[in-house]
UniProtKB/Swiss-Prot annotation:
It catalyses: UDP-N-acetyl-alpha-D-muramoyl-L-alanyl-gamma-D-glutamyl-meso-2,6-diaminopimeloyl-D-alanyl-D-alanine + di-trans,octa-cis-undecaprenyl phosphate = di-trans,octa-cis-undecaprenyl diphospho-N-acetyl-alpha-D-muramoyl-L-alanyl-D-glutamyl-meso-2,6-diaminopimeloyl-D-alanyl-D-alanine + UMP. CDD domains: GT_MraY. The gene is mraY. This is Phospho-N-acetylmuramoyl-pentapeptide-transferase. Pathway: Cell wall biogenesis; peptidoglycan biosynthesis.
Amino acid sequence: MPPLFCVLKAFFIGLVVSLILVKPLIWLKKQGLQDRIHKDHCEKLEKLHKNKAHIPTAGGIIFVLSVVLSILLLLPCNLWSTWFLVGATLLWGALGWRDDQIKNKRKVGHGLSAKRKFFIQNCLAIGTVLPIMIAYGESFLCMHLPFVGIVSLPHCWLGYLFSFSIAVLAIVGTSNSVNLTDGLDGLAAGSMVIACLGMLIVTFAYGAPWAFISGVLLATLAGSCLGFLYYNRSPARIFMGDTGSLFLGGMLGICAVLLRAEFMLLFMGGIFVLESLSVILQVGSCKLRKKRVFLCSPLHHHYEYKGYPEKVVVRNFWIIEFLCVAIGIFAVFWG
């Protein structure tokens, strides 16, 4: 089956699964998992988001189902890599699902503690990167840098350690960044569609050994997020929850590792990077200077505080993500 046809098929699998299954999932979630509007030390946010209370959450399970289905239908079942990806998909989905379950049981809406979640994410990332590094062999030391091209690291333990660390950081960092971005109706889902389509172009341009697998994953994620966006756009009828955001970020990071293009995430996931930087700057400034840089973080909440309508913020952030991806694509062909 031609690779391009498989990628298109993966996109439509994700799209159709989301469009068909999200609607009944909305009804099912109303029986259990619902969003909490409690925000620590953010009474204004609680008022702004009071209309979001009791909206079904954890809808991101759709993404997990879509990816597993695509992998089983489009990749050879006699290869270890197929079952490795199925396992990674289920484990990353399980992390977010467990977090949403705990949030639902607690009145204040807190899930796993930040330290425990970070520890589990690192364990999952290490368990994901190690088999990829072994499969790549010495080729794992080759990395694609924006505007530069392929760079080969020294063939020594330091080179492997650096490559391994960057890969783990890319997965964990992207997972948390998408999680931070998921704060407004349609923001994370729409941004993921743009990011995944951008990474698809990188896939065809680089042609890494695992490019076909990465293409199938990215196309499925793009289609699934697009279908989910129909129900998640303002006013949202369902939220992806941590089940969706942690999973989407983790899978986007894994795709970058498969392509040996972790640094391309700085552009392809530009809006996610900006959201994370806003939180880092805010926390750092509060601790060191006892002052805030933003009215509230992540960045999208800052503009909510300034009085911008939610739809305007989401639309503008999508535009920023599109521009970042455009720069990233230029960086690919320039290098």
